[in-house]
Amino acid sequence: MRKSLKTIDIISLGCSKNLVDSETLMGLMEANGYACTHDSDDPQGEIVVVNTCGFINDAKEESINTILEFAQAKTEGRIEKLFVMGCLSERYLADLEKEIPEVDGWYGKFNYKQLLKDLEGEQFEACEGHRHITTPKHYAYIKISEGCDRHCAYCAIPLITGKHQSRPMEEILDEVRYLVSQGTKEFNVIAQELTYYGVDIDGQQHIAELIDKMAEIEGVEWIRLHYAYPTHFPWDLLSVMRKHNNICKYLDIALQHISDNMLTRMKRHVTKEETYNLIERIRGEVPDIHLRTTLMVGFPGETQEDFDELIAFTKWARFERMGAFAYSEEEGTYSEQHYEDDVPEDVKQQRLDKLMRVQQRISEEIEAEKVNSIQRVIIDRQEGDYYIGRTQYCSPEVDPEVLIPVTDRWLEIGEFYDVLITDSEEFDIYGITIK
């Protein structure tokens, strides 16, 4: 393998699925002689690659502003080349090429590996590389599929990523084995629609089989499941969660709403009654499970009665974790083309604020119940006077963290410790290690 003097800085925007793509590209680049950095505050590389997000308006604006920032850097001679990849360029390529000519190459969601070939010329034969993990090495995201077949009325993701495509199971398991060999202990399994895994291959859901096999791999300490869908939920997955101690009692399942009016208009293909039954059964079959969900307010046609149903459901379900947002139109979606955005912005915000106040009280009560319990905690980092860690119930970056005073004892990053929880807030938990 020849060496290259070129250095590349990859700026990864958006979700964890985008991050996996960035890490895959970095591994490929490094295998072919490039030095790579990731999301540095002051990129020093001759080449910058921006991996964009195009999901919602705020994400689009962030992506465009980032591209323009580096286009200016190129104009000023601070970088040599600028490339763009990801969801935004997948969807708006023609417009972007016209408006930002400073970009040397545009790549979408699936053809970004072509970038290396374009850099090196037609005669260059790329060496395959392993992902370059940019998170702390003890945890990683495992993307098991691309795309989505659900076509919810508000969602632009299928317009960007296309139909659901499951990765081969053995390919996923090989990746897990490799990452274990590199020191990874925690695996956060992600997909646009986790529970659909395998349906595109043979018409059957294989998520339970995949997670069962993943849990059997020696060295896998934690598996956490993200982005399940309520329709046709695979009940055998709950059996697998009970079977293995290294599968976290945690499930991220986006529900969006509860009223039948909203669920129908959103094209969610699930009913209010089915949703209540789903939550009740999950909690019944996996005791102590922590559920994370996402809810939406202000969708076209949402009445006060619809919103009141959502509040009542939230109080009943007592989700341990919740993200919520106000509806905004996304170009090309069913709702943008067929519904009037008729809920006033101030009403959307009022409803969002009320929903989050309700959830805040629930979250505080749930975390307070953990005080005086002993939890297994993995240490992510040290910040000032505290080690920062997480329990099995906490996903990286989005959930509460455990703060342990550095005066308690010396702790190793990436290791597990038994921690006595001494206090809690909505977003922070405090504890001391059990010596």
Regions found by a protein language model. Name each.
Residues 80-86, 91-92, 96, 181-305, ...:
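Conserved SAM/AdoMet-binding glycine-rich loop
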Residues 24-26, 62-65, 97-100, 120-125, ...:
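Short, glycine/charged-enriched secondary-structure capping and boundary segments
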